[in-house]
């Protein structure tokens, strides 16, 4: 298991990285060129700025069993379809039981 963070605009990057380090869980950050991170011990993947470019980069590295932190309902749905878990930065889990309703109401 690894934790992948959709880091563009994610309010809990540093906290998540700290928890991953404490439990020896690999943590990967995905961002675009407008939000570049440099955190020791964390692998950072940088996508070009563009519609959903960070999401596609994250998906290309996703493995079954990974945990993804994202505020993006669409990305969460794609992660669930690939046998990964997805969590909102506030802590609630996206599941097959709630993702359709969330996708319906997204802006």
Enumerate the language-model features and the residues they cover.
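Nuclease catalytic cores that cleave nucleic-acid phosphodiester bonds
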Residues: 1-107
């Amino acid at each position: 298991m690894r934790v992948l963070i959709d880091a563009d605009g994610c309010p809990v990057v540093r906290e998540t990285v700290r928890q991953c380090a404490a439990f020896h869980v690999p943590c990967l950050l995905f961002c675009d060129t407008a939000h570049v991170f440099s955190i020791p011990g964390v692998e950072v993947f940088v996508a070009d700025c563009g519609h959903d470019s960070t999401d596609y980069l994250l998906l290309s590295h996703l493995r079954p069993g990974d945990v993804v932190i994202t505020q993006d309902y669409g990305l969460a749905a794609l992660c669930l379809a690939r046998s990964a878990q997805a969590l909102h930065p506030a802590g609630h889990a996206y599941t097959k039981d709630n993702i359709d309703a969330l996708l319906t109401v997204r802006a």
